[in-house]
Amino acid sequence: PRTRRVKRSDGRGNGGTPEEKRPRTAFSGEQLARLKREFAENRYLTERRRQQLSRDLGLNEAQIKIWFQNKRAKIKKASGQKNPLALQLMAQGLYNHSTVPLTKEEEEQ
């Protein structure tokens, strides 16, 4: 796979010493086709299967693991399904990610 190095600031916005950002992996068409085929067979890999794919595709195990995680997350997001526990907590008013502005009293505390 091809990777690229990207410099970024220290995150404080003051242009401090640049640090190395983890490079993004550009998978080849052959690697992607194989990963997609494996994913279609099973959404979760055993350690042994991940090691085999790593050898076959010339990728490290972390790259394969992250690809599978990202693929599962993408499908979950696209399906719009919510976690049953999250739905139950929302029904009870205990799970809400919306924000509301603080009152002056709350800001002063």
From Swiss-Prot:
Annotated region of DNA binding: 20-79
A GO CC term attached to the entry: nucleus
Name of the protein in question: Homeobox protein E60
One Pfam family cited in the UniProt record for this chain: Homeodomain
Classification via SUPFAM superfamilies: Homeodomain-like
PANTHER family cross-referenced by the UniProt entry: HOMEOBOX PROTEIN ENGRAILED, HOMEOBOX PROTEIN INVECTED
Subcellular location: Nucleus
